[in-house]
Amino acid sequence: MKLLLDTHLLLWAASDAGRLSNEARGLIDNRDNALFFSPASLWEVAIKRGLRRDDFKVDPRLLHRGLRDHGYELPIISQHVLAIEGLPAIHKDPFDRVWVAQATVEGITLVTTDSLVARYPGPIQLV
């Protein structure tokens, strides 16, 4: 299965695995799954780390290097951006909306820890 991980799952998998639920850990550890990340996650980490948020202490450059070295990047393309307009107005977080659009356009499952994101239609799994 192809899985797009949200930012929290990426951060926890990279630096705080104890915060992962058993379900999330099982999905990430399953070698039959292809894992992906969105550049929107790096954007979110860079912005929130720059704001000195306690939950975003990971250096986005190091995170990117580790993720890129494993071939996990799902680039943001025009179709993803255009799909955002058709999403329901569940909430306004631009990062979440990009992930939902990417997952929908690509036909892959977005794995998230956010119950608001899980309310969007499409291939989304709350863990």
Label each PLM-derived region with a short phrase.
Residues 57, 61-64, 68-116, 127:
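Active-site neighborhoods of divalent-metal-dependent phosphate/nucleic-acid chemistry enzymes
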